Amino acid sequence: MFADLGYDIEEDKLGIPTVPGKVTLQKDAQNLIGISIGGGAQYCPCLYIVQVFDNTPAALDGTVAAGDEITGVNGRSIKGKTKVEVAKMIQEVKGEVTIHYNKLQADPKQGMSLDIVLKKVKHRLVENMSSGTADALGLSRAILCNDGLVKRLEELERTAELYKGMTEHTKNLLRAFYELSQTHRAFGDVFSVIGVREPQPAASEAFVKFADAHRSIEKFGIRLLKTIKPMLTDLNTYLNKAIPDTRLTIKKYLDVKFEYLSYCLKVKEMDDEEYSCIALGEPLYRVSTGNYEYRLILRCRQEARARFSQMRKDVLEKMELLDQEHVQDIVLQLQRFVSTMSKYYNDCYSVLRDADVFPIEVDLAHTTLAYGLSQDEFTDGEDEEDEDEEDTAAGEPPRDSRGAAGPLDKGGSWCNS
């Protein structure tokens, strides 16, 4: 466009250096090398690579990248040609084709502008919105917003809640079993003391046997605690290390994804701006000066897409391993728990079945005398009533009357009233 005015405009490279080079690519079965071309006459003084497609000769070779300028095909200059003419030149060559290029030495940090940062924030907000809400607010949703890994993250949160509940329940259960074992130990101590003090041999042996049974149950409880406690450690390891690590990886993946989507949206906006100017017939400065800003964004988009693909692959592998570990671990822990509980109850039943000593015959009178040797003779009050009746029959006042004090006479002696 500016050439029609009678003068040329120098390319505005934005301080980005370029390095010339050439690469020979072997075409695939469809006679393609796997690149898309942009720029060219009549609006842009140079032609450049817009995108390198995956699993194509250009992508597998890795020499050229998005944003690189194409200067020739098989030694023929393409200056002043349109992108359609250059595409035909490449298609006419069979087998191997040599591409001459100027490598764009771009720094991805140059493309990380405030606009990209704001777009990342917008994508974060739109991520958790429904389509209706986003449309009502006038926010566009990128194609990757409904990502399956986000749902996997929600499943991971539910799994974390499951493990947290199991951990708390196991802690409470272990605490209850510890208190129960201490109760059995106290029972054993009490019955052991009773058995030692019991004078009758048969009853003493029965109490001691019953005490030993409770002490055995206490040992079974301690063994259960030692067996199940590692289960609690494994659950905490999965809950506090594996799940947070995966959650952090997914958050990093989402950050890379939002960055890639931001560059895609930026490219779309710049394309729309260019098409609008072409439709109006007005020259666009950045296009007429080599479109280096657009090519920088193309390079940033390609690198962001590569990071996004690699991060997505890593997250999928980690999620798969975590799911397998979850299935295997939960089955192993539940089997350990059930087998330990079953063994505990079977052992308790076996011990109590062998300790079936009831009913126990105890001589209460003999036991009372044996336990009361160090105490005074026991009286129930009936003997005192008998003595009072005998004193009354002999003409003596009862003890209550004798013990009562009368008023004093004038001489200071006691008298009976």
UniProtKB/Swiss-Prot annotation:
UniProt PTM: Phosphorylation at Thr-82 appears to inhibit the interaction with AMPA receptors. Palmitoylation on Cys-415 is essential for long-term synaptic depression (LTD).
InterPro entries named in the record: AH/BAR_dom_sf (IPR027267), AH_dom (IPR010504), Arfaptin_fam (IPR030798), PDZ (IPR001478), PDZ_sf (IPR036034), PICK1_BAR (IPR037959)
UniProt keyword list: Actin-binding, Calcium, Cytoplasm, Cytoskeleton, Lipoprotein, Membrane, Metal-binding, Palmitate, Phosphoprotein, Synapse, Synaptosome, Zinc
Species classification: Eukaryota, Metazoa, Chordata, Craniata, Vertebrata
One Pfam family named in its UniProt record: PDZ
Positions of S-palmitoyl cysteine lipidation: C415
Positions bound to Zn(2+): C44, C46
PDZ domain mapped to chain residues: 22-105
Keyword Transport in record: no
Matches recorded under SMART domains: Arfaptin, PDZ
UniProt free text on domains: The AH domain mediates binding to F-actin.
Region (Disordered), start-end ranges: 375-417
Chief place where the protein resides: cytoplasm
Record's protein name: PRKCA-binding protein
Subcellular location per the Swiss-Prot or TrEMBL entry: Cytoplasm, Perinuclear region; Membrane; Postsynaptic density; Synapse, Synaptosome
AH domain sequence ranges: 144-357
Phosphothreonine PTM positions: T82
Subunit structure: Monomer and homodimer. Interacts with CXADR. Interacts presynaptically with the glutamate receptors GRIA2, GRIA3, GRIK3, isoform 3 of GRIA4, isoform A of GRM4, GRM7 and GRM8; with NAPA and NAPB; and with BTG2. The interaction with NAPA and NAPB disrupts the interaction with GRIA2, conducting to the internalization of GRIA2.
PROSITE patterns per UniProt: AH, PDZ
